[in-house]
Amino acid sequence: MPAALRCASVTAVALDDFEAALIPTGETDIFVRRAGSGPPLLLLHGFPQTHLMWRDVAPRLASRYTVVCADLRGYGQSGCPASTPDHAPYAKRAMAADMVAAMARLRFDRFAVAGHDRGGRVAYRLALDHPRRVDRIAVLDVLPTAEAWTRADARFALAFWPWALLAQPAPLPERLLAAVPDAVIDDALGGWGSPAGVFNDGVRAAYVAALRDPDRLHAICEEYRAAATLDRAHDEADQARGRRITCPLLALWSAQGPLGTWYEAADGR
């Protein structure tokens, strides 16, 4: 790893065999864990997780790829840059630029990327904004942000409460999450389809700790505010211009989750 990278001092609960680094990208620092050899593969997590969501998958992928598991800005051990009234520092466009810079510091100018949930949105924005950097892309449990808002109904609101709740003006969402971080994590991990026992105590504790950090709470809410405004506008602008992802793309979703029916509806248009 280049000497310019500043190694992070962390107590890991998983991925102990992966090298840890805190990479300066200009606007913030991005925490990564890296291992393996072969073509580079960037893995991006969702809410309310961190890079630890890949703890069971990344070691297997590292037998074939150079795997980089990153924390999005505002999440995990990455930096929490100050936001602005338009939430631009937490738009997926800014998060995608972080990943381009971080991978460049790791000397990867072109790479594959896979993202789940919020990370999937960063992944497809990365492929749209930086097509020469992305070799191929996989998105897991994701509809484009503009499409999700267009289709939003009562079922969506009840199943994906963070979308509208966390996008409310500060400080209400931050205060609500700060009051019951354990309940938020348990609902997210247990209520969104995870079988019992998948998340060990260390991983759960790491996720809860993030929601006890006021700066991270605000950053996460800013990311949702950006999704409801800037991210949606960026998607709509791309659609209006006919701008598309040009590299190979794999979209996967759970057959038993609500996204399944929405994908079927999209296919039927």
Indicate residue ranges for each PLM-predicted region.
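Flexible "cap/lid" subdomain of the alpha/beta-hydrolase fold that forms the substrate-access gate
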Residues: 2-21, 28-30, 40, 68, ...
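Active-site beta-strand termini and strand-to-loop segments that position acidic
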Residues: 25-26, 34-35
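Short, flexible helix/strand-to-coil boundary loops that buttress conserved ligand/catalytic motifs
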Residues: 36, 55-58, 79, 150
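Short beta-strand element of the alpha/beta-hydrolase
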Residues: 39-45
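Serine-hydrolase catalytic-loop signature spanning alpha/beta hydrolases and amidase-signature enzymes
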Residues: 48-56, 67
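Recognition helices and adjacent regulatory flanks at domain boundaries
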Residues: 53, 72-75
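A short, Lys/Arg-enriched amphipathic alpha-helix followed by its capping loop at the start of a domain
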Residues: 56-65, 105
